[in-house]
Amino acid sequence: MNNQRKKTGRPSFNMLKRARNRVSTGSQLAKRFSKGLLSGQGPMKLVMAFIAFLRFLAIPPTAGILARWSSFKKNGAIKVLRGFKKEISSMLNIMNRRKRSVTMLLMLLPTALAFHLTTRGGEPTLIVSKQERGKSLLFKTSAGVNMCTLIAMDLGELCEDTMTYKCPRITERQPDDVDCWCNATDTWVTYGTCSQTGEHRRDKRSVALAPHVGLGLETRTETWMSSEGAWKQIQKVETWALRHPGFTVIGLFLAHAIGTSITQKGIIFILLMLVTPSMAMRCVGIGNRDFVEGLSGATWVDVVLEHGSCVTTMAKNKPTLDIELLKTEVTNPAVLRKLCIEAKISNTTTDSRCPTQGEATLVEEQDANFVCRRTFVDRGWGNGCGLFGKGSFLTCAKFKCVTKLEGKIVQYENLKYSVIVTVHTGDQHQVGNETTEHGTIATITPQAPTSEIQLTDYGALTLDCSPRTGLDFNRVVLLTMKKKSWLVHKQWFLDLPLPWTSGASTSQETWNRQDLLVTFKTAHAKKQEVVVLGSQEGAMHTALTGATEIQTSGTTTIFAGHLKCRLKMDKLTLKGMSYVMCTGSFKLEKEVAETQHGTVLVQVKYEGTDAPCKIPFSSQDEKGVTQNGRLITANPIVIDKEKPVNIEAEPPFGESYIVVGSGEKALKLSWFKKGSSIGKMFEATARGARRMAILGDTAWDFGSIGGVFTSVGKLIHQIFGTAYGILFSGVSWTMKIGIGILLTWLGLNSRSTSLSMTCIAVGMVTLYLGVMVQADSGCVINWKGKELKCG
């Protein structure tokens, strides 16, 4: 027997209300349905249709709908929306097939014609603005009302940078690889691509420019982006500080008084020290300095002047002269070629054809100001073609250069040289000033190579110069970019991958290779974007590393060069030759300062009463014997005993005494000069070899009185150079040196006199031609850096 209790069944009516449950009415179902939709409940397709309904009516969705929208999976939602799109397209086609009345068209056209309608080659053209994106553009044609749809993503503000292409006619197929289509006839569309601020689209990529490193010119001028200038300034600061300790202490005191912290004091002191080297003596403050000493009775001296160096000439009974090449100017150089480093494009137009319909054509292709590119693209039903295949495609864009640089040819007849000549007078103001105030400037041109300048109290000096720069201008181009200029290799300049035009001045410039600054994007069925690269100025600055930088002043360019001059000193006289020797005592005004040329500067003040007079000056050893020192300042004299006198001299190597005055009242200064005579000889030889590498054949003319010994090297090169080059053309430099040493050794050890002399002569000539520098190649020994450089 089953004693299990049965479950109580649900009553068929409500015991409290005493009434049966009823079926919901229609209004209750509608209320429940709408409430569920507003909260985002229901099937996906139904909810998305309701969301579209709200969007059409511009009704903001509820929080529940937004939450449900966020929960939809991407693939499923896209599939539903594509179904909506297909249904709407079908509805549009049905509506387009209906016959509309004239009244209906007149009502629709004003709302659709928010764009500008024109024609291109007899075909309709729409000029649309940014607001027309995604809208239906309606206009009347001979085939009926044409409705075009434009969904271009690059649609921007109207400007000169426009995009023009043809919208194909697509009726029953889904558009493929197009962002504009029409339903009645093919239509051209034009729109701007600028941003709201009017800026054009640019590509950030830079052109790959080959660096100029390794193609630089052998001059003493600093190269672009090198550290030479900084090191030279530091060396000048060090030399000036050691020479002027009093001013250095004053600068330190000023920095301590002005600055509030250690960092500020240090910065102020460094800035003061960087400025002070501008107060230096001409030639004394220049690192590259050459001394030329003429023989007794000399009436002329040959010198070679170059930028960044100074020449000091000395001759018996003649004043000591400091000569420096201030600048080399070139006026109105001819323009060889112009390069474009920044451009802009406009009026981009594209034409495309279906397969088997021939080549695409554009009128712009015949215009030299347009850059064009042809290609082939895939065409088919989805972009207005009845056949599938490759169709012809052509895009053109108008090219305009915004920033350009010029390459100019320098001609010898357009050169002008400025040479400054300063006399060593011992004036204290002359020592403390590097300006041209105390010197006389001569101007040399190829048309007037001779100049006579008057030196106050010292007569006249005639400069007979040969305007030979030492640079082969057939291989050099003067590159000018904005306010900067460089001397560059001509072939490097011509090989730069940048748009170029000829140097001839014309009203309309025609650029070649415009495509080097233009990027054609991926070609679509009816459209291709074209963008221009950004400014290449930064890339050019990087590529110019190692080039010789040139200063420009207006239309005149100042650059590195060389000048060979003959100084005719027959009209020069030495001031104070009739004065007697000073008998009084001298007082040292400043500590003896050593220059970077091995000379010393002595500043003394005369305490006697017999001025004007000549200053006795000599260099002696500890026993009082006069040594072979050299007095750079010729015939130092005292004019006014109240003014100090500066004397430059070259003491001998080792320990010596600088004696100023005579007798027991003489001022005796102990001095020690580092180095040796043999080392100086080798260093001078190496310096001459470097000058030869820089100046070429001009360097061999450096000397005085046209001496034979200075031309021996040139003579050997001219006689034996050609034969030597033919015999040893395939032999390495080390092998040439080895052969020369071997022949010399055989000559020294040979018992036969004739054979010995022959071997020694041939060995020495071979060794000389192998070591010394010719006009086109050679080797230089750097004794200070302990290295050998060949080139």
From Swiss-Prot:
Gene3D superfamilies, per database record: 1.10.10.930, 1.20.1280.260, 2.60.40.350, Flavivirus envelope glycoprotein M-like, Flavivirus polyprotein propeptide domain, Tick-borne Encephalitis virus Glycoprotein, domain 1, Viral Envelope Glycoprotein, domain 2, Viral Envelope Glycoprotein, domain 3
Segments on the Extracellular face: 120-242, 281-725, 776-791
Record region (Interaction with host EXOC1): 1-15
Keywords of the record: Capsid protein, Clathrin-mediated endocytosis of virus by host, Cleavage on pair of basic residues, Disulfide bond, Fusion of virus membrane with host endosomal membrane, Fusion of virus membrane with host membrane, Glycoprotein, Host cytoplasm, Host endoplasmic reticulum, Host membrane, Host nucleus, Host-virus interaction, Inhibition of host innate immune response by virus, Membrane, Secreted, Suppressor of RNA silencing, Transmembrane, Transmembrane helix, Viral attachment to host cell, Viral envelope protein, Viral immunoevasion, Viral nucleoprotein, Viral penetration into host cytoplasm, Virion, Virus endocytosis by host, Virus entry into host cell, Zinc
Pfam families according to UniProt: Flavi_capsid, Flavi_E_stem, Flavi_glycop_C, Flavi_glycoprot, Flavi_M, Flavi_propep
UniProt-annotated stretches for the region Fusion peptide: 378-391
Residues bearing carbohydrate: N183, N347, N433
Propeptide cleavage-removed residue intervals: 101-114
NCBIfam families xrefs: flavi_E_stem
Name of the featured protein: Genome polyprotein
Lineage: Viruses, Riboviria, Orthornavirae, Kitrinoviricota, Flasuviricetes
